[in-house]
Amino acid sequence: MEEGTAMRKGGWWLALGMFSASALATCPDWPLARGRQETSRLHQQIVAWKEAYWRQGASGVSDDVYDQLTLRLAQWRQCFPGATPEDDDLPPPTGDARHPVAHTGVRKLADEDSVARWMKNKSDLWIQPKVDGVAVTLVYRQGRLVQAISRGDGLRGEAWTARARQIPALAKVMTGELADSVLQGELFLRRDGHVQQQTGGMNARAKVAGLMMRADAAAALSQLDVFIWAWPDGPSDMRRRQQLLAQAGFKYSGQYTHPVSRIEQVAQWRQRWYRSPLPFVSDGVIVREGREPPGRVWSPGKGEWLAAWKYPPASRVMQVRAIRFSIGRSGRLNVVAELEPQRLDDKRVQRVNVGSVSRWQMLDIGVGDQLQISLAGQGIPRVDAVVWRTAERHKPTPPPAKFNALTCYFATPECSEQFLSRLIWLSSKSALNVDGVGENLWRVIQQQNPMTHIFSWLALTVEQLQAVPGISAARGQHLWHQFDLVRKRPFIRWVLAMGIPVPQGALAQLESENWHLLAAKSEAQWRTLPGVGEIRARQLVAFLHHPDVVALAQWLSGQRIPGF
C-alpha cells in the first residue's frame, strides 16, 4: 500500500523506526560548510524527483532508491543543522476532492522483533500482502461509482473518477451493503506470476501513477486492477467483509487476507509471498486488526491498528568511504570501493569490486558518492548504479600499471598482492579445489612461512602448518592432508592453477596432454583448438616458454606431480 508514495508527500511521514543505525551509520567526515552544501544539493534533487512524480507520474529513480536517499537526507540534516529548512518539502498536489474517510497511511516496522512487539496484546489480526501501486478511494452511492480520488495528502486528492470508470476491472455498480460504501485500496499493475524475490519492484508505483495521469492511456488502463484493503465503517467481521467484497468482484483482498495470531505465522506468510508467484508487485506485508475505529476518526499518520513489514531490499544505497586499488592474478589493476557497512539479505557488505580502472572512470565513482549495491550470483556484491555524486569530487590517482599475466609467480615485496591473488585462484574450485583454504589462510601462512613461489606450500610439513597462528594441531594435520591430496589432481588442473590462457572450449582436448607436449606446440597447432585465434595462440606459446613458468614446471616435476 502506497507507503513509498507517502514518503514523497513530505518528510513528516517517514517512520522513525526506519531511521536506524544499521541502515544509516555515522555522519560524513565533512566540514560544516561542505556538509550543508551536499545536504542542500541532495534535498534539491529529491524535491525535483518528487515534483516529477507528482506532476508527470515520472520516476527518476526506483522507489527503493528514492526512499533510501530520503532517509539519507534526514540523517544529513541531523549531521549538518541548518542545511535546509525542515518544512520546505514540496507538498503533494492535494486536488479539490475531499476523501469521505481520510487515508491513514501505514507505519513501517523495521524487523521481526518490532512486529512481534506491535502484535503483543492485540487480537483479531489479519495479514495481507503490501501491494505496490497507488492508493485510491472509491465512493459508491445508491449502487453507483460516483467518485474515485487519489490519495493526495490523505485528506484531499485529485478527482480520478473519469479515469477510474475506464478501468475494466473496477466495479461500476454495487448492491447490498456495498451500494453506499467508501472503499480504500491500491490500484496496481496486473502481473502474471510476479515473483518479488526474483524480479523486484519494477517501479510499479510510478507506472500506475503515470497511467492515471496520462490523457492518452485509456487502452492501457485495462492493465490495472484494484486491491481493496479497507472498508471504513463496513462489517466488523473480517470474514464477512472479505466475502462481500469477493462477491462484488473485488477478488484479491479475500484471496490474500489471512488470520494470524503469532509472529511465526506472519514471518511464514511474508516469506511465502516474497518467493511465490503473485498477480501483482508487492513490497512487504501488512498486519492489521480486524476491528477498526469509526471512519470519522481516521487521520493521516494515525493508523495505529495496522503496520507494515517490508521485504528485504533487493539493493541498498551505500556511501563510498574510500577507493583503493588491488592487483588480480592476471596483473590487472582492479578498483575496490570501501563502503559504509550495511546488511543486504543475510550478508554484511562493506566493500564492492568496481572492476577495471576504465570502468571505474566511466562510472565516475568518488569518495562520498552513493552507490546502489545488490548481490549477484553466490552473494557477491555488485554496483548497479551511482545514484548520487557529491559536489566535491575526491578520486585517488591509480598507481602505474606494471604487472601482467606473467608476473609474480615468485614472491617479492612489490608482488605481494598479485602473488596472493594467484594463491587464492589456485586453491579455488575452478583450479585445484583445496578444501577449506582461502584468502585469510594464505595470508597467515605467508606471514609465518614465507613462500618462494606459488606452489611452495606443497613442501610445508605438518609441524610448520601447526605452528601457524590460529591453526590448531588438528587443523594443521587436516590442511597437510588436503595439500597432499591435491598432488593427485589431474594435470589439466595444475596448468589451470598456473594460469594457462586456454579457452574453456579447448580444455577437454588437453586432458590427455603433458607438459612437454604442450610446450612443443607451435602457434599454428594451438590455433587448431576451439576458441584459439592468432592472439591467444601467441599468448599460449609465450606462457609455456616464460622462464618463471618453466621453473615452476620443473619444480612440480621434482614433486612428482602428474604430467610434469
From Swiss-Prot:
Protein name (database record): DNA ligase B
Pfam families hit by this protein: DNA_ligase_aden, DNA_ligase_OB
Function: Catalyzes the formation of phosphodiester linkages between 5'-phosphoryl and 3'-hydroxyl groups in double-stranded DNA using NAD as a coenzyme and as the energy source for the reaction.
Organism name: Klebsiella pneumoniae subsp. pneumoniae (strain ATCC 700721 / MGH 78578)
Upper lineage: Bacteria, Pseudomonadati, Pseudomonadota, Gammaproteobacteria, Enterobacterales
Enzyme Commission numbers on file: 6.5.1.2
GO molecular function: DNA ligase (NAD+) activity
Catalysed reactions, semicolon-separated: NAD(+) + (deoxyribonucleotide)n-3'-hydroxyl + 5'-phospho-(deoxyribonucleotide)m = (deoxyribonucleotide)n+m + AMP + beta-nicotinamide D-nucleotide
Keywords: DNA damage, DNA repair, DNA replication, Ligase, NAD
Signal peptide stretch: none
Active-site residues (renumbered): 130
Gene3D superfamilies: DNA ligase/mRNA capping enzyme, Helix hairpin bin, Nucleic acid-binding proteins
